[in-house]
Curated annotation (Swiss-Prot):
This is Pyridoxine/pyridoxamine 5'-phosphate oxidase. The lineage of its organism: Bacteria, Pseudomonadati, Pseudomonadota, Alphaproteobacteria, Hyphomicrobiales. Binds 1 FMN per subunit. The keyword Oxidoreductase applies. Belongs to the pyridoxamine 5'-phosphate oxidase family. It comes from the Bacteria. It comes from Rhodopseudomonas palustris (strain BisB18). FMN binds at residues 60-65, 75-76, 82, 104, 139-140, 184, 194. The gene is pdxH. NCBIfam families: pdxH, PRK05679.1.
């Protein structure tokens, strides 16, 4: 725990005074860069929370595939449970947890689909086997057996022995545009540091508040 609390940020701040940060995306970039060097698996993994039509929450782990000042991007099947829930209620919460650094970041905001061009560009970077799997999978639908899935994969693979695999029309991405960030850092005796950034719209400035642990 003492090692984690002595980390230096590129900005010159230490983990103990990260609360001096004034812009959440820059702070996230610093923390994510450090997590990318310390997390043993998937530093871009994030919990994605959505709400179903009955108001019941659903949460699952997904991989962040990009971020910038406009938000955080992930991809999946449009007809999946998450896709259907986001279509009905385009709001979500994210959680990044980096155990190696004793840190987490929470995000909440509105969700919008990425453009076809953006989805096409990302899909083209996936391995061919992953591209084929996206065509074969009917994500979140009942599956008779693993063998049936493997047969579907083989059928798609046979159609794409040569050449590029196009993006399935039912597979795309979403962008979560933050209205709220919360940065949490572990401290001894549970006297943790927490700061929150809020804004009413993407055009408004951020308001920062320090929170009790």
């Amino acid at each position: 725990m003492s090692d984690a609390t002595s980390i230096k940020h590129p900005s010159g701040l230490t983990s103990g005074d990260f609360t001096a940060a004034e812009e959440p995306f820059a702070l996230f970039a610093e923390w994510f860069a450090e997590a990318s060097g310390s997390e043993p698996n998937d530093p871009n993994a994030m919990a994605l929370a959505t709400v179903d039509p009955d108001g019941l929450p659903d949460v699952r782990m997904v991989l962040m595939k990009g971020y910038d000042s406009h938000g955080f991007v992930f991809y999946s099947h449009i007809a999946s449970q998450k896709g259907r829930e986001l279509a009905a209620n385009p709001k979500a919460a994210l959680l990044f947890h980096w155990k190696s650094l004793r840190r987490q970041v929470r995000v909440r905001g509105a969700v919008t689909p990425v453009s076809d061009a953006e989805a096409d560009a990302y899909f083209a970077t996936r391995s061919k086997q992953s591209q084929i799997g996206a065509w074969a999978s009917k994500q979140s639908q009942p599956l008779e057996s693993r063998f049936a899935f493997e047969q579907a994969i083989a059928g798609v693979a046979a159609k794409h022995l040569i050449g590029a695999v196009p993006r399935p029309p039912g597979w795309s991405g979403w962008r979560v545009t933050p209205a709220r960030f919360e940065f949490w850092h572990d401290r001894p005796f549970r006297l943790h540091d927490r700061i929150e950034f809020r804004r009413d719209t993407p055009d408004h400035p951020w308001t920062k508040t320090r929170l009790y642990p």
